[in-house]
């Protein structure tokens, strides 16, 4: 499968793993190709045994529908085939670059196919961002936020340890990662702000995910302006959240979507 790559991979890390991988890990292998679908070739690490087979079957059963839905959100673009590897571990998921279609998905305990499918959506949608080339950057906070929102839309029950909204709500100052974009996909504070803001656009203001994706820009503030023609993105967002979650009080939020707030 090749040697360790020195370039920083693009990752989908569970909370508490914000220490980004410094290089793509050596592929464990050997792998068994379990099967191929219309969109994807799915293999599992042999060390996973029958659990790997079952997880691969779960992914094969869902990946075409998942890729099809992501394609709909991205207005029908097609990035080509995906090569999926299910690996032992709890690292989340990664690929070598935003455009890389070789995706590595963690098996976790080997018993939750929907979790692995959520990881797949989170990496697949980043490839679509790269192909779309409209401003969403999978290696930056706003692109990572979009990745998580889309993955949770497909598998809402699996967000769990990947929820990021509280990381931003529970800071002392709630920094403005709407007007600015942080050039990392591993800071749960900026990612949490981004995920909350995208859900604000969708579930508070009523814009479809397809419209939000199409409004891509280098900052979420510009996405908001593209959609609304207004320039008060962070003020409107932060003022609304302050009403529900007063600054300085633990939010208790366990999802990335507290909207609508009435």
Positions of predicted regions on the chain:
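Zn2+-dependent metallopeptidase catalytic core
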Residues: 1-139, 143, 150, 154
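Active-site rim elements
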Residues: 56, 178-188, 199, 213, ...
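Beta/coil-rich, acidic/histidine-enriched accessory regions frequently appended to metallopeptidases
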Residues: 8, 219-262
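Acidic helix/loop microenvironments that form the catalytic cleft of cell-wall polysaccharide enzymes
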Residues: 148, 211-221
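Active-site-proximal structural scaffolding
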Residues: 63, 140-143, 190-194, 205, ...
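Post-HExxH zinc-binding segment in Zn-dependent metallohydrolases
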Residues: 66, 137-188, 206
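Alpha-helical scaffold elements that line and support the substrate/ligand-binding pocket
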Residues: 123-132, 147, 190-208
């Amino acid at each position: 499968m090749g040697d360790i790559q020195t370039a920083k991979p693009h990752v989908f890390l569970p909370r508490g793993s914000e220490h980004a991988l410094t290089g793509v890990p050596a592929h464990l292998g050997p792998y068994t190709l379990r099967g191929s679908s219309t969109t994807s070739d799915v293999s599992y690490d042999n060390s996973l045994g029958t659990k790997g087979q079952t997880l691969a079957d779960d992914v094969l059963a869902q990946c075409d529908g998942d890729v099809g839905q992501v394609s709909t959100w991205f207005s029908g673009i097609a990035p080509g085939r995906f090569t999926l590897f299910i690996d032992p571990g709890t690292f989340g998921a990664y690929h070598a670059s935003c455009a890389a279609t070789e995706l590595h998905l963690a098996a976790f305990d080997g018993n939750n196919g929907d979790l692995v499918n959520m990881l797949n959506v989170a990496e697949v949608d980043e490839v679509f961002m790269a192909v779309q080339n409209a401003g969403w950057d999978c290696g930056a906070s706003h692109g990572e936020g979009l990745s998580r929102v889309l993955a949770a839309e497909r598998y809402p029950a699996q967000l769990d340890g990947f929820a990021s909204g509280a990381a931003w709500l529970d800071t002392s100052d709630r920094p403005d990662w709407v007007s600015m974009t942080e050039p990392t996909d591993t800071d749960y504070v900026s990612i949490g702000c981004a995920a909350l803001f995208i859900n604000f656009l969708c579930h508070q203001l009523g814009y479809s995910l397809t419209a939000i994706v199409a409004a891509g820009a280098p900052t979420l503030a510009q996405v908001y302006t593209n959609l609304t023609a207004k320039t008060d993105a962070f003020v409107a967002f932060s003022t609304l959240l302050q009403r529900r979650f007063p600054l300085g009080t633990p939010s208790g939020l366990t999802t990335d979507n507290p909207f609508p707030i009435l």
